[in-house]
Structure formats: structure tokens, C-alpha cells
Swiss-Prot record:
Source organism, top-level taxon: Viruses
Protein name (database record): Putative protein p21
Positions of region (Disordered): 73-102
Length: 102
């Protein structure tokens, strides 16, 4: 319902719909790119495309650096030196090229 009017495929829509990063449920240094797949049949962790799950380090890696928008009111955003990982509390949205075609 409504998928035919959405620029994104249903799978991406479902993924985005369950990506509710709640800071009180995780440690402060929890990687916001890692989300438990409670609503999906896939066990373990889910990564937002184009992120891919790396089993050895148990984290999400992205092949191309893309901007991550911090849409929360929290101001305690820090960057880990040398790694480029954004550590913060709040909600995160990964920007895709299709999102900027407004």
C-alpha cells in the first residue's frame, strides 16, 4: 500500500521503517549503523545499503563515504580520530543520491 508511489523499493522502505535508533537502549558508543532486525526474518544485524555487514569486526562498513545527517536535538556528537566514525546519540539518516533529487 503506497509502494507504487514510493521512489524506493519495498525492501528499503521496510528497512528504513524499523531503523529507530534509541540511545537509551544501547551504550553511548554503539554504532548507529548497526540495527537489530527484530521485524525481519533475517537473524543478527542489519546494515543500511550501501553498508555491508563485516562478520569479523561485527560492524557495518560502507564502500563510499556518504554524509550522515544528525537529525536529533542532542549536541553530544563526537568523531573518533582517524576512523571517521560518528559517535553520538539520537537518530541517524543515511543520505542517498535519490534523496537529493528534490
Amino acid at each position: 500500500m503506497g509502494f507504487e508511489n514510493s521512489p524506493h523499493p519495498p525492501t528499503l522502505f521496510l528497512l528504513r521503517s524499523i531503523l529507530r535508533y534509541k540511545p537509551h537502549q544501547h551504550r553511548t558508543n554503539h554504532n548507529p549503523m548497526i540495527v537489530q532486525c527484530r521485524s525481519l526474518t533475517l537473524p543478527g544485524l542489519c546494515c543500511i545499503p550501501p553498508y555491508t555487514f563485516q562478520q569479523r569486526v561485527s560492524t557495518c562498513k560502507k564502500p563510499i563515504l556518504r554524509q550522515i545527517y544528525h537529525i536529533s536535538s542532542h549536541q553530544d556528537r563526537t568523531k573518533q580520530s582517524g576512523r571517521g566514525r560518528i559517535l553520538a546519540r539520537g537518530k541517524y539518516v543515511v543520505s542517498h543520491p535519490s534523496d537529493q533529487a528534490h
